[in-house]
């Protein structure tokens, strides 16, 4: 679940597409302080799973159906995106409950 409150703005650094999916590489700062493989990150409100990460970037796979049904298809390198980590249990609840699953 997400609160709908944007934690930071990230930047698309690379998009790799193949027959079954696209892989987004996203530059970020604040959320990178506590990120793990498998974490859920809302990217422009759409829940994506972290598949890899480095010091200042993370990657997420996006299935073609998700691309076809969302504005993620409009992204290109250099695009700015809204980022939010999933709400932690017992964490502060300052927005409203949002599920970003397609």
Roles of regions detected by a PLM:
Residues 1-102:
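Conserved loop->alpha-helix
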